[in-house]
Regions:
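Rossmann-fold cofactor-recognition segment
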Residues: 56-69
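Rossmann-fold scaffold of SDR-type NAD(P)-dependent oxidoreductases
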Residues: 23, 86-95, 118, 141
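Amphipathic alpha-helical dimer-interface segment in Rossmann-like NAD(P)H-dependent oxidoreductases
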Residues: 79-84, 117-137, 173
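N-terminal Rossmann NAD(P)H-binding glycine-rich loop of SDR-like oxidoreductase domains
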Residues: 26, 31-34
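Catalytic loop of short-chain dehydrogenase/reductase
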Residues: 138-163, 168-176, 185-189, 195
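Catalytic Tyr-X3-Lys loop
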Residues: 104-123, 136, 164
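C-terminal helical subdomain
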Residues: 183-184, 202-261
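Conserved mid-core segment of classical short-chain dehydrogenase/reductases
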Residues: 72, 86-89, 95-112, 153-156
Length: 269
């Protein structure tokens, strides 16, 4: 049985004062991260296709970040909500593994939607919040090993995440030193995206067999969110700004965000 993992809550908060904007906030890691941030007393602006449930210190915005019109709407709403207030952080957590299958079989519209959601939207959201970020503001892009490799049948996802890696590097070049930008790989997490990877016919998507067999190793979204929260709020400015992605399976970091006596016993695939 996997042990419950909770981060140290007594570590010094390194995040500047201000709002935190989270995309992909209605499900998976994004939703859990919103809960953690709110519990820490941080005001959150949550962006998602389906608006999050109302909560104290939460502003929920509904927009489709996978097309140009929806993205423009999201940016306009975001600027209105910010209303000149400081933004301490932006977490780009929105993503989708679909469409699945060979890249050459995907439609132009599906490919453009994937790129817009996972590469263009992070750029436009960063551009929207950067003018309101104080020195020390942070942008955290949720990435994947698919940003560094190619997996059969995941061509559109890999393409988009490779683009997100380039976005991270470009934003770092454009915004440093005032605003720091980091990339985080949360591992194999038990979210709806995993269900999307298990459900297809293995004859059409061979990796479905792997994902069906890997369910026991999936990390609960709440634990992945705790790791994201630690990186965003409790690492030092120098640490956060490191060039390599943060990786949840990195044992060197685990003692810093796991409670004493807890174990991270999820096997890296």
């Amino acid at each position: 049985m996997h042990k419950s993992v909770v981060p140290f809550l007594n570590q010094r908060n390194q995040l500047q004062n201000g709002l935190v904007v989270v995309s992909g906030a209605s499900r998976g890691i994004g939703r859990e991260l919103v809960h953690v941030l709110l519990a820490s007393g941080i005001e959150v602006v949550a962006l998602s296709r389906q608006a999050c449930k109302p909560a104290e210190n939460l502003t929920a915005l509904s927009a489709d970040l996978s097309d140009a019109d929806g993205l423009s709407t999201a940016v306009d709403m975001l600027k209105t909500v910010i209303d000149g207030r400081p933004v301490a952080g932006l977490v780009n957590a929105a993503g989708d593994v679909k469409p699945l299958g060979a890249l050459i079989h995907q439609s132009t519209s599906d490919l453009l939607r994937a790129l817009c959601l996972m590469a263009v939207a992070p750029v436009r959201l960063a551009a929207a919040v950067a003018p309101f970020m104080p020195t020390g503001g942070r942008i955290l892009n949720l990435s994947t090993r698919s940003a560094q490799a190619i997996f059969p049948g995941l061509g559109a996802y890999c393409m988009s995440k490779h683009a997100l890696h380039a976005v991270t590097e470009s934003l770092r070049h454009d915004l440093n030193p005032k605003i720091t930008v980091a990339e985080l790989i949360p591992g194999e997490v038990d979210t709806g995206m995993q269900a999307d990877l298990r459900n297809p016919d293995p004859d059409e998507f061979p990796l479905a067999s792997f994902f069906r067999g890997n369910r026991a190793n999936l990390i609960p979204a709440a634990i992945a969110a705790q790791f994201c929260n630690w990186v965003l709020t409790q690492t030092t400015p120098e640490e956060f700004n490191r060039p390599e992605p943060w990786f949840i399976y990195d044992r060197a970091d685990q003692p810093r965000w796991l409670t004493e006596g807890s174990a991270f016993d999820y096997t890296e695939p």
